[in-house]
Curated annotation (Swiss-Prot):
Catalytic activity: L-arginine + H(+) = agmatine + CO2
GO biological process, one term: putrescine biosynthetic process from arginine
The keyword Lipid biosynthesis belongs to this UniProt entry's keyword annotation: no
Organism: Xylella fastidiosa (strain M23)
Protein's recorded name: Biosynthetic arginine decarboxylase
Residues modified as N6-(pyridoxal phosphate)lysine: 99
Keywords: Decarboxylase, Lyase, Magnesium, Metal-binding, Polyamine biosynthesis, Pyridoxal phosphate, Spermidine biosynthesis
Chain positions recorded as substrate binding sites: 279-289
Pathway assignment: Amine and polyamine biosynthesis; agmatine biosynthesis; agmatine from L-arginine: step 1/1
Family listed: Belongs to the Orn/Lys/Arg decarboxylase class-II family. SpeA subfamily.
UniProt cross-references to InterPro entries, sorted A to Z: Ala_racemase/Decarboxylase_C, Arg_decarb_HB, Arg_decarbox_C, Arg_decrbxlase, De-COase2_CS, De-COase2_N, Orn/DAP/Arg_de-COase, PLP-binding_barrel
Amino acid sequence: MTWSQDLAHKTYSIRHWADGYFEVNDAGHMVVMPLGGDGVRISLPEVVDAARAAGAKLPLLLRFPDILGHRLGKLQAAFAQAQSEWEYAGGYTAVYPIKVNQHRGVAGVLASHQGDGFGLEAGSKPELMAVLALSRPGGLIVCNGYKDREYIRLALIGRKLGLKTFIVIEKPSELRMVLEEAKTLDVLPGLGVRVRLASLGAGKWQNSGGDKAKFGLSPRQVLDVWKVLRGTEYADCLNVMHFHMGSQISNVRDIAKGMREATRYFVELSRLGAKITHVDVGGGLGIDYEGTRSRSDCSINYGLQAYASHIVQPLASACEDYDLVPPRIVTECGRAMTAHHAVLIANVTEVEAVPEGRVPGVCDDEPAVVRHMREIYGELDARPAIELFYEAQHFHAEGLAAYTLGQIDLVHRARIDDLFYAISHGVRERLSHEEKSHRPVLDELNERLVDKYFVNFSVFESIPDVWAINQIFPIVPIERLNEVPTRRGVVCDLTCDSDGTVKQYVENESLDSALPLHVLRHGEAYRIGFFLVGAYQEILGDIHNLFGDTDAVEVAVDGRGYRIAQQRCGDTTDVMLDYVGYALDEVRRVYAQRIAAAGMSAAESKALSDMLEAGLTGYPYLSDVPLE
C-alpha cells in the first residue's frame, strides 16, 4: 500500500480525535488550526524550532489560546441552536471550573470573554481568590466544594463588590454558616443547592455522580434546606439548582437519564416556592481521546450538538408542562473547553530495538533445550505456526529455568533468546488477523516484538492520568508523516519507574499496545506530540525523580500567521531541590568544600565548580540536541 496523507491521518486516527484542530500537511508535518478548519494552519515543527531559537527547551508545552476561545464559542453556539430548536427562552452560560487548569494563561483567556454567556467556578479558597480577580463586573461565579467561614465570607464579599456569586450548599452544615455570615456582612447571599442524583454514568469518573457521590444533598436534606429558608428574607435567595452527572460521560443515554431525574428536582423545588433562576448541570461533556466514537471510557458516542440538545429538551418540556419560567442553563464543561489547546512536544533520545533474532551456529556442547529450539526454527515452513510458537514458549521457559539452576551458562542462555526471537518473528510473518484463530497469538507477538522509544519527558509530570487511571492520549510524531513508519514502538519516559511507560495507543480508529514510528536518523531530531493534554494534566502532574514543570510557550494567531506571545521557563534543578527541603547555600558550600579537598589546580577547580553550578541551575530533563 502506497503511503499518503490520508493513510497518515487514518493510521493515527487524527480526523476522529482532532475535532478539526490538527491535521497532516504535504510536508509530513502535524499542523494546528487554532481557529478551526477554515483558519490559519501552523506547522508544529516550525513552532518548536522557533521556540527553541528563542531559548525554549524540550520537552516543551505548546499552548494555543485561540483554541480556548474557539471551543467556548462552539459550546455557546451549540446551546444557542438547541434553545432555538426547542423554543427555550432561559438562556445559557458556559462556566469554566478553574480546577481543570488554573494557569493564568488558560483561566484568564477564557475569563476575557465578556457577556452573560460565560462564568467561572471555584472549588477552594485559593481558586475563589483567583476567580474574584478574573471575573468581569457582574460576572457569574459558582462557589462549590467544602467551605468554612472564611470561604463563605470571601464569596459574600464578592457579592458586595458587584459579582454574581452563588454559594452552592453541598453539606447541610454550610447553610447556617452562610446565613450567619450574610447577616454579619449585611448582604443577601446568592444561594444554590447541589442535589445528589441517583443516576450514575459509567466510566473512570462515575463516582462524581450517584448516591455515593462525595458532594450533594439527599432528597431529605434538600427539603431541610428549603424548610430553613422558607418564609424568611432569604427564601428568594435560593436561585441555583446544581447537580453533577459525572465527568467524561461516554454514553449520551447517561446524560438523558440524568437530565430526566434532575428536571424532576427543578420542578419540585419550583412547586415548593423556590425561585430557581439557574440550573447548573455541572460537567460531563466528554472528549473523544481515542477517536473511536464509542462508549469506551476515553471516547464519546455523541457530538456537541447532541449534548446541548439532551440538556435543553427536558427542561423545555418541563417548563411547558408545568407552566414554569425557563431557568438559565449553566454547564461546567472545563475538559471540553481546554483539552485541545495544549500539546506536549518531546524528543526521542534513544531507541532500543527489539532483537531481530538470529540463528547461532551449532556448537559441540549444545544443551538439549538449545537443540529443541533450533529444530523448531527449522520447521517454520513445515508445521502450523501457532503450534510451533507454543512449543518455543515451552522450551524458552525451560531454558530460563535451567539457567537459574546453573545447568546452562550465559552463552547458551543468550542462544536460547536469539532462537526464540527468530522463531517469534517467523511465526508472526505467517499469521494474519483475517484468521480469527490467529488473533490471540498475533496480538501477543505484536505486544512482545516492539521497540522501546525513550522520550525526553516524565509521564508522571506531563500526562499523569496515563499512570493514575490508564487515560488515553493521542500520540503522533510531529514530522516525517510523509514517510512510512516502519517500526512499532512503545513510549518510555526518563523516570526510574516501570510505570513510566505508555501502554495503549490510538491507532486506526482503535487502541493498540504499540505505535507505528520511524527509524531514527543520526544527527536528526525525532519529536513526538502528546495531544489533548490541556485539561487537568499540568495541575495534577507530580515531581517523580524531581522532574518538574516543562518549558511552555503560548502561540497566538496574528495577521502574519502566528507569534510566540509568551514564554515560560520550566523548573530548574535548584527549584526542585528547594521544593523538597534542600538548603541551596548548604549544597553549594558542600560542593566547594569537596572541590577544595580534592587537591586540584585552580583552573580545574573552577571548571568543576562551574559545571556543578550549571547542573544545579539547569533544566532537569535531558539535552534536546540529537546525538551524532
